[in-house]
A protein has these predicted regions:
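Tandem CBS (Cystathionine beta-synthase) repeat/Bateman regulatory domains
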Residues: 1-282
């Protein structure tokens, strides 16, 4: 099976074009639940692939509005690459999306979800038990944690989720980057540079050097509601045990439109199975 058999073709892709703004990207991420959007530019009448902008980029750079500065380069692949080789590249580079290119032209995107869908359909190997693939380290937060704090925890942990625990340390839900982006909004304002010069009134300062007025610079921030995480999390949890196969779990992920499921041993949280973990079993 090759990348061409699993990828999303260019005709079905949502892209943003340079020049453009962060609001264009945020709109698509919120509307479609994507993790990133390809960036293209028209050069001499031809569409040229430039890079990707992800939801992490928007949150990490709240004051940047230019797509050319927000976007980043990521590994690419070709349509005739094997799905196994592409999956290995996704895992090694921790890239959720591989742009599929033909020269400078974008011909499609291969996502983690595309590969998971192939596993679910039995088109590639999916017989390994997920207990051997799961990540045992779990990022967690509390139901009463303010959303901005929970979002920061997710960012610091370097994972796209936090399992939400109640007062008894039992699973109450899960908060994902998708949940955060859905309620994020861009707020514009101004910040003053101040109207005085440091030490302007000291005895040794040069005479005549005084501040003549404040300057105001435009600012742009991503703002999140300050309510507790329980108001924004997903509370209908799908869990799996370690004896389930990668194919079984892939089918659960596709059916429920999620990127990860908690791994349980009885009723105890034992790990997390992320969609990208399943690619390691191919």
């Amino acid at each position: 099976m090759n990348v061409a058999d699993a990828m999303t073709p260019r005709s079905d892709l949502v892209v943003v074009e340079i020049p453009g703004s962060r609001n264009d990207v945020l709109e698509y991420l919120q509307e479609y639940g994507f993790s990133s959007v390809p960036v293209v530019k028209t050069v001499d009448g031809e569409e040229v692939y430039r890079g990707l902008v992800s939801r992490d980029d928007l949150i990490d750079q709240p004051d940047e509005d230019q797509l050319a500065l927000l976007m980043r380069e990521v590994p690419t692949t070709t349509a005739d690459t094997s799905i196994e080789a592409a999956a290995e590249l996704i895992v090694s580079e921790e890239a959720r999306r591989l742009p599929v290119v033909d020269g400078n032209a974008l011909v499609g995107i291969l996502t983690v979800t595309d590969v998971v869908r192939a596993i679910a359909r039995g088109e590639v190997d999916g017989d390994q038990q997920v207990g051997e693939l799961a990540t045992r380290t779990v990022n967690a937060t509390h139901v009463e944690t303010p959303l901005p704090v929970a979002e920061r925890e997710i960012g610091l942990a370097g994972v796209p989720y936090a399992v939400v625990l109640d007062d008894d340390a039992s699973m109450a839900g899960i908060l994902t980057e998708v949940d955060v982006v859905e309620v994020a909004r861009v707020v514009e304002g101004e910040a003053s540079t101040g109207d005085s010069i440091a030490e302007q009134d000291s005895e040794w300062s040069w005479e005549g050097i005084k501040a003549t007025g404040a300057r105001y610079l435009p600012t742009r921030n991503v703002e999140l509601p300050v309510g507790p995480t329980r108001h924004f999390m997903t509370d209908e949890l799908v869990t799996v045990n370690g004896t389930r196969t990668a194919r079984d779990v892939a089918q659960e992920l596709i059916t429920n439109d999620v990127e990860q499921v908690p791994l349980v041993n009885g009723t105890e949280l034992a790990g997390i199975v992320r969609d990208i973990d399943l690619l390691e079993g191919i």
